[in-house]
Amino acid sequence: MANQKCDELIELIGLQRFYIESITNVMAETGKKWYDGEIGIAEEHMITNIMRKVVEINNHKIEVKGLIEGVVVICNPGGDDHTMSNLVLEGLLKIRKYKVVNIGGNWYMDENTKATNTAIINFTIETRPDIVFISVTIARYLFNAKLIAKELSKALSNTKVFLGGLGTQGVFEGELQNGILLANKDTLNTLNNL
């Protein structure tokens, strides 16, 4: 039933608008309700899991036909395992004919921060992407994301390396090392200027 309603809405407004307007608003409202104590963490996780499934199903339906625009790696720093924004970004990039390699997810820091960073960096370098998006949802992982971005911008001089997400609020372009770009808070603006 829920998938049918989503499909009807996507048919009406298009997948991009569905992701930007509907999914983003549901997740923002859910986060606000959790933060304000109106719902518990279990309810927040349930809603997130439902929305994640909806996005994953629709991402798998996107067919990239013809020449691709380039290869994009999406990742997040160790410890920041909020993958919802990565999945939405993946779909928006696939709509624009990019081949997307999404390695965001459950990277746990513990004592292995350096090993985690190295794994992310090495995989990304081996992939040789045209663009890298490092998504930071929680600000405490921003330092780690900047370390990854710094290494990638040195190793992949012809690759655009973007740092973005809720965890980058308050960061200014001038604070970032040369070769690292701050993704616009308006996701579509960033994507339209690739």
Show which residues each predicted segment covers.
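Long amphipathic alpha-helical segments
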Residues: 1-63
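Residue-level signal for short, function-critical loop segments
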Residues: 76-80, 106, 138
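Short helix-loop-beta junction
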Residues: 88-102
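Cofactor-cradling patches in redox/metallo enzymes
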Residues: 100-101, 108-172
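Peripheral docking tails and interdomain loops at the edges
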Residues: 161-194
